[in-house]
Structures are given as C-alpha cells and as structure tokens.
Design a protein with these regions (language model features):
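Amphipathic helical hotspot of TIR/SEFIR-family domains
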Residues: 88-95
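Adenosine-phosphate binding glycine-rich loop
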Residues: 5-6, 95-106, 110-149
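Conserved sugar-transfer catalytic core signal across GT-A, GT-B, and GT-C glycosyltransferases
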Residues: 36, 90, 111
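Hydrophobic, well-ordered beta-alpha structural blocks that scaffold small-molecule cofactor pockets
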Residues: 1-81, 86
Length: 149
C-alpha cells in the first residue's frame, strides 16, 4: 500500500508554519498511528495525544493544532459502496472542542469511507482535508510502487 504519512506530515508542517512546539491528536488503531507518531516526534512536536476512537476527544481538541483520523478496522461499506456507518468524528464533537478557539485546527481524514463529518470543515477555525481532497493533491502510486508493496 502507498504510504502517505510523510506527505501528510509535510502538508501539516506547511499549513501550520512548522510543527515544532505544537500538539497533535492521532485517532485510530495503534499500528496505524505509530508511523505518524514517529514522524511528528522527529518534527519536534511538543505533545502527541493518541486515541483508539474519536469518542471523548472534544476535551483534547482545545490543546491541539493537528488531528489525524485514520481508518478504523470495524467500519465497513454498504451494498452501494458507501459507508454503512456515520462519520465517527462529528461536527458537533469538533465544535465543542473548538469553543473560544483562536488558532486554526487542521484535520486530516485518512479513512477512505470518511471518518470526519464534512460539515466540520465549515467551522470557522477548522481546516479539513477530506479523503477526496487528499486523493486530488497527493501523488498517486505508480504501477511499479503498487507491485512492490
């Protein structure tokens, strides 16, 4: 599988004007979070919070500038190919965590089925990269890369 972690961290670095001294929240299975954790630590992030699921993360949101939401293994598609479950990180959860926020919150939704409600991107302090946004801006793997993985 084409690994996009370095590109995602690079985009976050550019959008936030650097990662040093900032804080992040990684949401998803531990094995998926580990590469992002390593890359963010290498970039000298001050705090890296981690959670298996987005439940109860609104209390952490005021303390972070970056959220990376990864695919959760128990999500599945319905017969039409869409998500059979609603987005896990709702706009309401994000709005609660962004009350009185003065700095931007950058959110990357890395779940192909979309784990972050798109309405969250309309909140004044939120910049949301949806799976579709990432497909458009990140380099696509070549056939050679796909065969090698």
């Amino acid at each position: 599988m084409h690994d996009i972690a370095p590109e995602v961290v690079s985009i976050a670095d550019a959008c936030l004007g650097g990662l040093q001294g900032r804080s992040a929240l990684l949401i998803g299975p531990k094995e998926q979070r580990s590469l992002y954790d390593q890359l963010l630590r290498r970039a000298h992030m001050q705090n890296i919070f981690q959670a298996e699921t987005p439940r109860d993360v609104s209390a952490l949101l005021p303390h972070v500038q970056l959220v990376i939401s990864m695919p959760l293994p128990f999500r599945h598609t319905d017969e039409a190919g869409g998500s059979a479950t609603a987005p896990m990180l709702t706009a309401a959860i994000i709005a609660r965590g962004c009350e009185r926020r003065r700095t931007p919150l950058l959110i990357f939704d890395l779940d192909p089925l979309s784990s972050v409600e798109e309405l969250a991107g309309l909140l004044p302090s939120v910049c949301l990269y949806t799976p579709e946004d990432l497909r458009k801006i990140l380099p696509q793997p070549t056939a050679v890369e796909m065969m090698a993985s």
